[in-house]
Amino acid sequence: RIANAFIEQSEFDLAIATYEKGEKLMKGQFHFTYNLADLYRRKGETLTMLKYYVDGLEDGSINSMSLQNVLAAYLEPDKHKDLRALLYEKLESKPDFIPIIEILQWTFIQSKDFLNALRQAKALDKRTGENGSRVMYIANIAANEGDYKTAIDGYGYIKNLGQSGGYYLEAYR
């Protein structure tokens, strides 16, 4: 409530201090990473905002789909590089953390870098055993955007999974 009162008065620094104090008092039992990220967004501090959003993925206070929606609405395309740098940094300590890989894949899609998006999709597919659903998604986007080389690569991956994969026949179309 106190932080919200500060936000209503556009006193973002006081709201930030309130959330930070709340986290200390809660001793890690509750995280305000999403709230802090939003406040830094309002202040125009993009790098700090991104850091908190990525931390929110890690502490579970935000999921990758929600973060994609927020980033689509508020992140300028020229800041995707900064986000990728944070994601790669986080992946060094948590290479199998799927939400980070999902956001990384999303940044490549937004930048129309379908080859790197496909690489991430393949990595996720191998880790999760999803039978190619993410790969098929990226391959279809690449084909629709005219990146046929990447699309063919994705469809080839699906074909190599064999007929037991749910997208085998669709990959042949």
Give each language-model segment a name.
Residues 1-173:
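Acidic, polar-rich low-complexity tracts and alpha-helical solenoid repeat scaffolds
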